[in-house]
């Protein structure tokens, strides 16, 4: 179960995971639950609230998740729930990360063992607590040198021999969806709005010169970073269409720089933005592969299922080469129902 920073909705999957020589999976069912206006507004603004209000929403969101699971998983025997929750704070440099959707509450409401709070341990080990998906790229999507997810942030995992490293490339749908909503749309379907806009050269230059892009890996981004570094660059005089056009170009440049050979697997909601994908192709030297619709939309949720399975087996599911932690770990907290 996965909820991303782009606030597209709640991704639910039911999977069988099989371990022989390698890990494989079978996707049995998948669905995205669109957030209503209450949850969209609540999740977008919860970081501004006090601790008491956040705790209250933590519990009510857990009940919401549990109810959705009970409906979604009806007639299926579920051994384990792996819940990412929804990120409210993520500032690993301050040793802070918070994903709401209390795992104990979900377990008690559903009567199913629940693994949650996947980022906390890695942050305590001086890691970024992100990205967590690369272990799944390594185990389930071995044949692709690059795996790129175009979600709230564009992130990448890169395989070299039997090793993998990963990082967030740049903000993406967290920006594109915000400025699409200002125009009355949930998102920029097919990049139609961006395509109508013009590139703001000064903004593009300022974006491309952000210090984050010269930092060494591992590194990760957050909503807090976006608020401090991106929004101050966007003047009120700029039209939303031009902002979208400029940001598409910026993202394409940054993503294209990172994929220079072999085949790149693209997933996530941004993959449906054909204008963005064409701009990425323009800047990239890799062969771009776009999989089936369910893999595009549910790859991250599938991998969080694997993270939960690895945790229950007490196996490594978080890699220090990816997060910068002092050691590999088995992240997540196991909650058994009363």
Indicate where each model-derived feature is located.
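Conserved phosphate-binding/catalytic loops in two-lobed NTP-binding clefts
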Residues: 283-303
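Extended, folded domain segments that form the structural surfaces/walls around functional sites
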Residues: 187-192, 252-253, 273-286
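Conserved ATP-utilizing enzyme core subdomain
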Residues: 5, 9-33, 162-252, 261, ...
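Conserved acidic residues
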Residues: 78-79, 145, 262-264
């Amino acid at each position: 179960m996965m909820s991303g920073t782009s606030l597209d909705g709640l991704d639910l999957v039911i999977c069988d995971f099989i371990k022989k020589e390698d890990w494989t999976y079978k996707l049995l069912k998948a669905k995205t639950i669109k957030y209503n206006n209450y949850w969209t507004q609540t999740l977008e603004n919860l970081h501004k609230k006090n601790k008491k209000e956040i705790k209250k929403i933590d519990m009510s969101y857990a009940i919401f998740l549990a109810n959705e699971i009970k409906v979604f998983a009806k007639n299926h025997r579920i051994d384990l729930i792996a819940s990412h929750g929804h990120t409210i704070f993520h500032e690993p440099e301050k040793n802070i990360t918070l994903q709401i959707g209390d795992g104990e509450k979900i377990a008690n409401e559903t009567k199913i063992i629940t693994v949650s709070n996947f980022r906390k341990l890695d942050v305590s080990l001086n890691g970024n607590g992100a990205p967590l998906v690369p272990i799944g790229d390594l185990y389930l999507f071995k044949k692709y040198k690059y795996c790129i997810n175009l979600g709230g942030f564009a992130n990448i995992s890169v395989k070299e021999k039997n090793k993998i490293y990963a990082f967030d490339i740049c903000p993406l749908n967290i920006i594109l969806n915000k400025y699409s909503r200002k125009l009355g749309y949930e998102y920029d379907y097919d990049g139609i709005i961006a395509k109508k806009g013009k590139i703001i050269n000064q903004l593009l230059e300022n974006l491309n010169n952000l210090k984050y892009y010269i930092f060494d890996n591992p590194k990760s981004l957050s909503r807090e970073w976006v608020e401090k570094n991106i929004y101050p660059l966007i003047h009120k005089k700029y039209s939303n269409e031009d902002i979208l056009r400029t940001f598409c170009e910026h993202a394409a440049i940054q993503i294209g720089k990172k994929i220079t050979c072999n085949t790149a697997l693209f997933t996530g909601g941004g993959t449906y933005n054909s204008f963005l994908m064409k701009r990425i192709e323009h800047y990239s030297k890799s062969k771009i592969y776009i999989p089936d619709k369910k893999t595009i939309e549910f790859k991250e949720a599938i991998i969080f299922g694997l993270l939960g399975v690895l945790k229950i087996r007490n196996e490594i599911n978080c890699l220090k080469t990816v997060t910068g932690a002092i050691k590999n770990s088995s992240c997540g907290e196991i909650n058994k129902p009363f």
